[in-house]
Structures are given as C-alpha cells and as structure tokens.
Amino acid sequence: MTAILPVRFTAMKWYGKGPLETYPDRQCGGRMGVYSEDVRNQPFYLRPQEYGLHTESRSMRLTDPDRADFVRFEAACPMAMSAVPYSDLQLWNARHPFELPAPEALYVHLDYAHRGLGNSSCGPDVLPTYRIDDRPCRFGFALEAGLGEREDNPFGPIPEEIPAYHPWKAVEEQDGTPSYRDPSDPDQRSNAGMV
C-alpha cells in the first residue's frame, strides 16, 4: 500500500529493524529497535533505485518538524515500511541523481510482503525463499494523524515514545469461531487460557 503525504513530513521514527535499510534477504545487520532519521538524509544509491525499506516494522511516525503535525501507521503484524521523497516511477526513470525532480511529496510504502533484492544485475536471481507468489493476501494497519502541539490542536500533544508492539494471539472460542486476544492485557490472557 502506498500513501502520499506532503513533503514536509521529513522526521521519521519507526519501531522495526534498523538503523539502516533492511530487505528480506539483507536484514542480518539490522536490529530491532526504535530509530529516528530525516527522510532526506537516508543513504541513497548512485544509480537511483528503490531504497530505505525497514523490515519487521510495527509502527512508523512521520512528523513535520516545523509544525509538529504528524501521521502515524501502526501495523497489525510485522510489515516492511519505507518513506522516501520520490515515487517508484521517478526512481525508475532516472539514471543519475541529478535527473530526479525536486521532491514534491513523500511516498510511504506499507508492504505485507516484499520481494528480496537478489543479485540479478551480476549474478543469480532472488532465492526462492525470498520470492513472492502472486496470490491474494490480507493485512491491516491503523492510521493516526494529529496537528501537533499548537493551540488549535484538538488531539493533544504528540506522544514522545512509540508504544511497545503487542502481537495479538489467535484463539478459538468455545463455539469454534476464531477470535483474537491481546497478550499484554492480563484479563484477556486469563480469559483465553494464556496465563
């Protein structure tokens, strides 16, 4: 899923693998944690191409540092997320960095699955483990937006820390229907027999 935001949302904070980009077949050097960076300062390639992905991400917040407006994405399951100031088409069409247009928007990518990079430019293709089958999938995420800490902000101040990710556990109810429980909630753990 791709969302397009105003280019002014340059401050990125995420909970996932980092601090540098990670891809499904190139993530051993990444460590889970909360990281921050300016999307304009992400490492870039000499030949424009996709960049800036963070695998195993649970949450990402993009903020306008001048106005403190923010947009936050919270994944229902670990996903691959990125935020870059160029569209895929702009990166594809440019052979050199000077051919890229001045950034006019921020492109946020939320990927349930992402194909590995491989090395097909000078070697073998992606290993079968890192390929993606052409099949339907379902994923979910929550979107939160706020106006920052100005007097006219009806949402209140921006939280300083991203809350910890708590995976939900699928359980089967007594009548056989599937349900989900939040393992961080003691009452739900007890009711689901997860204690």
Residues of each region from the PLM?
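Beta-strand/loop-rich accessory regions of lumenal/periplasmic or secreted enzymes
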Residues: 1-195
